[in-house]
């Protein structure tokens, strides 16, 4: 379909506030390479959050996000502590070798997420992928006949 978004799968927000990111997204973005990832607020429409890592973000045209926020660049903020910058908010969290991220109540509340929610994992750019919480893409996924794997 024209302008279709590639879907990696869905990730469940588990009781222990962990999220297992879809394997294909992990591979494409080499997301576990640094042991830490940046989360930033998603679009108003899709909500949720986007996932990237330092070596993807720093050399990109969005690298100023890190150069303007050295505490974020050097992981000196607390894990899951959001810093607001130019209309979006950014934090870092650890990621396991198998692609599990541990959220905390602060992140859940800040992003309006809840336990049991299924986030739709979407390829958004060559810098980040999106874990969407709402909006037309999620509605289309709900009505999709094929299988979307849940992690």
Language-model regions: role of each:
Residues 1-16, 39-98, 124-151:
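Intrinsic disorder/low-complexity detector
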Residues 1-3, 28-32, 78-85, 107-114:
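Short, solvent-exposed secondary-structure boundary motifs
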Residues 14-30, 95-112:
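Short beta-strand-centered segments at strand-helix junctions
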Residues 35-41, 115-122:
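DNA polymerase processivity clamps
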